[in-house]
A protein has these predicted regions:
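Nucleotide/phosphate-binding catalytic cleft detector across ATP-hydrolyzing
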Residues: 1-10, 16-137, 148-149
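Acidic, divalent-metal-coordinating active-site segment for phosphoryl/phosphodiester hydrolysis
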Residues: 142-146
Length: 149
């Protein structure tokens, strides 16, 4: 199976496509197929004006359409699209989510800072960490910082 993740941050949007490689029921991994980054600065609009401007929305829709084509070409089975700090703060975020769904069929979730930290933490294999130590995971983004202990 192939999976895609779309990350809408304050300074860029990213598409990651990975394929699950299954050796056995307990032995599998994900192989990166593609990673695309578009330097679209939603935070520049939101943190100054409180909303995402029309020009930036237009570029966001075009980027999502391009991402949709890349997912189709790569036969992606499942996609999750998440937006973080800038979209949490944008007064027109609900409008943007509806527009993206109508234009591309992609459902954009605006996730909380807590969910963002949980997703980052879930990428680490705890079994590979030394249990004699404590760890802190820090994500410094363009509009927020998340900590996981």
């Amino acid at each position: 199976m192939k999976f895609a993740a779309i990350d809408i941050g304050s300074n860029a949007i990213r598409l990651l496509i990975e394929e699950s490689v299954i050796k056995s029921k307990k032995d599998f991994y994900f192989k990166k197929i593609a990673l695309t980054r578009v330097p679209l600065r939603l935070g520049k609009d939101v943190f100054v004006n409180g909303f995402v401007g029309d020009n930036t929305i237009s570029k966001l829709v075009k980027s999502f359409k391009a991402f949709q084509l890349l997912m189709d070409i790569n036969d992606v089975n499942h996609c999750r699209a998440c937006a973080t700090s800038a979209m949490r703060e944008a007064s027109n975020s609900e409008f943007i989510c509806k527009l993206l769904l109508e234009e591309t069929g992609i459902n954009l979730e605006i996730i909380s800072g807590k969910e963002e930290a949980r997703l980052i933490f879930s990428n680490f294999h705890l079994s590979s960490l030394d249990s004699n130590y404590n760890y802190i995971f820090i994500d410094v983004g363009g509009g927020s910082t998340e900590l996981s202990l």
